[in-house]
A protein has these predicted regions:
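Short amphipathic alpha-helical interface segments
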Residues: 2-32
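N-terminal glycine-rich phosphate-binding loop and ensuing alpha1 helix
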Residues: 11-14, 63-126
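Key DNA-contact positions within bacterial/archaeal DNA-binding proteins
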Residues: 35
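A short, conserved structural fragment
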Residues: 45-54
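Conserved beta-loop-beta/alpha segment of the NTase-like Rossmann-fold superfamily
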Residues: 130-201
Length: 297
């Protein structure tokens, strides 16, 4: 059966938590109103997707399978010039923040969500990423030999046929809330935090759907580089990435400009909202020093 968005949200929380939850618990965890949760729980009970104890049934698990995330793809090829001097000898995703590599905060969440396939696209000092295979033996590493000649669309070009039911993650994000990486996703989406003003990459939305990507804005969502593409959009991206990459000026594009700007008419991407302390993007060496005082010497 096809689930409504609210049914999906409640069912995935119940599956993830694997413990008896009250409707108040479900409201707090989902951000839905108590009235909406009450109505949704009744629907799930009537369909035998949960039992009287608010635990998921076999039928409930089966109903989630079409929404299962198949893989997580990490874009990790760039130099990270604004993080010099630390990136002169270490790729930015492998920089330690409070004793843990930046990319490992993401990888641990992917493993926790039981996502079966993990791909890392490397470039600058790519051989150093092999150290991750000791802790994460199922990682597949793909080398982008053109990382220094083109923007990150060159990394997306290499994995364009693997984007169906897949997360795409920038590898320089420090993740504090692992629940942002989920076993199931309802629809194609991009992570964002609501802000009153920003000078960073952001997007405008209408009824929860991204309508415009831009740099700087008011009353908008600041972008974070974690997105998900369902089967339909993943297949479309395969075609669009190839077309844009091979067009004049295409190699200068950021890869996410394809679904959010250049070819946005082909997609319906929703914003998945995160909170202030869920995730941090470290752009500069000064920002790194503020987060981890060990570098402030």
């Amino acid at each position: 059966m096809e689930l409504t968005y609210n049914q999906f949200e409640i069912l995935t929380i119940i599956e993830r938590e694997k413990s008896k939850l009250s409707q108040r618990n479900l409201a707090d965890l989902s951000g839905l109103s108590l009235g909406t949760v009450n109505k949704t729980v009744s629907e799930l009970l009537n369909e035998n997707l949960i039992n009287e104890d608010n635990m998921i049934t076999d039928k409930g698990l089966k109903s989630l399978e079409p929404y299962r995330v198949k893989r997580a793809i990490f874009l990790a090829a760039g130099f990270g010039s604004r993080m010099v001097p630390i990136t002169l000898n270490t790729p930015k995703p492998l920089v330690l923040v409070k004793g843990k590599r930046i990319i490992e905060t993401l990888l641990d969440a992917v493993v926790r969500a039981e996502i079966p396939e993990i791909i890392i696209v490397t470039g600058y000092l790519g051989e150093q990423f092999e150290v991750l295979q000791k802790k994460y033996p199922n990682i597949k590493i793909i080398e982008n030999k053109l990382y220094n000649e083109a923007n990150n669309i060159s990394s997306a070009f290499l994995i364009r046929d693997k984007l169906q039911n897949s997360y795409v993650l920038e590898s320089d994000l420090v993740l504090y809330n692992p629940n942002l990486i989920r076993k199931y996703e309802y629809e194609s989406n991009f992570l964002g935090k609501y802000v009153k003003v920003t000078d960073d990459w952001c997007f405008e939305t209408k009824n929860g759907i991204i309508t415009k990507q831009k740099v700087g804005g008011y009353d908008c969502f600041q972008m974070y580089g974690i997105s998900y593409y369902d089967a339909k959009d993943g297949k479309q991206l395969d075609n669009d990435i190839k077309a844009v990459y091979n067009a004049p000026g295409g190699k200068e594009k950021y890869w996410d400009q394809i679904p959010l700007d250049v070819c946005k008419q082909n997609y319906r991407i929703s914003v998945r909202e995160c909170k202030e302390n869920d995730i941090i993007e470290i752009d500069t060496f000064n920002e790194l020093k503020k987060i981890d005082p060990i570098y402030d010497v």
